A protein has these predicted regions:
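C-terminal interaction surface of TIR/SEFIR-family domains
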Residues: 1-28, 91-139
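Conserved RecA-like helicase motor-core motifs
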Residues: 29-39
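Short acidic active-site motifs
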Residues: 44-49
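An anion/phosphate-binding loop that grips the pyrophosphate of nucleotide cofactors and donors
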Residues: 56
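Hydrophobic acceptor-binding patch used for acceptor engagement in glycosyltransferases
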Residues: 59-60
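Conserved TIR/SEFIR loop-to-helix hotspot centered on a Trp-containing motif
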Residues: 65-84
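A short helix->loop->beta-strand "cap" motif at the edges of active sites that frequently abuts
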Residues: 84-91
């Protein structure tokens, strides 16, 4: 079943991959909260992020060295792990190889590998929701 809305947790330094993923999901009919798009000028971004975490029904985190060192990614992951709505609805994506041993919570989840191939990663992620990849919708 497709999600109502996906929270996309990422490190801003990892652009353009998070942007490309948000675009791909949106083009496949999956609503995404992606802070660079959904938070506009004059908004209090901390409140917007908290509101999105409370509203979304799936949590996708893009793992990279930047992400595992990001205070905000750590906070977002901690929130998702404690919120029962996200039980069985947290999807970690490995974008860039990084030391995952420090992330004890990861042992609970199957990681989707985006490090080798963006298209294959998108195919596997969309399959989680029963959606087939349409290559013409890739950025």
């Amino acid at each position: 079943m497709p999600p109502a809305e996906v929270f996309l947790s990422h490190a801003s330094e990892d652009s353009p991959m998070p942007q490309n993923l948000a675009t791909t999901l949106t083009r496949h009919g999956v609503p995404v909260f992606f802070s660079p798009i959904n938070i506009t000028g004059a908004q209090q971004w901390q409140n917007e992020i908290l509101g999105a975490l409370q509203r979304c029904d799936w949590f996708v985190v893009i793992l990279s060295p930047n992400a595992i060192n990001s205070m905000w990614v750590k906070r977002e992951v901690a929130y998702a792990l404690q919120d029962r709505r996200y039980e069985d609805r947290i999807v970690p994506l490995k974008y860039i190889d990084c030391p995952l041993e420090s992330l004890q919570w990861l042992t609970l989840f199957q990681i989707i590998n985006f490090a080798a191939d963006f298209k294959s990663g998108c195919r596997e992620l969309l399959r989680v929701w029963g959606i087939g990849l349409r290559e013409e919708l890739l950025p």
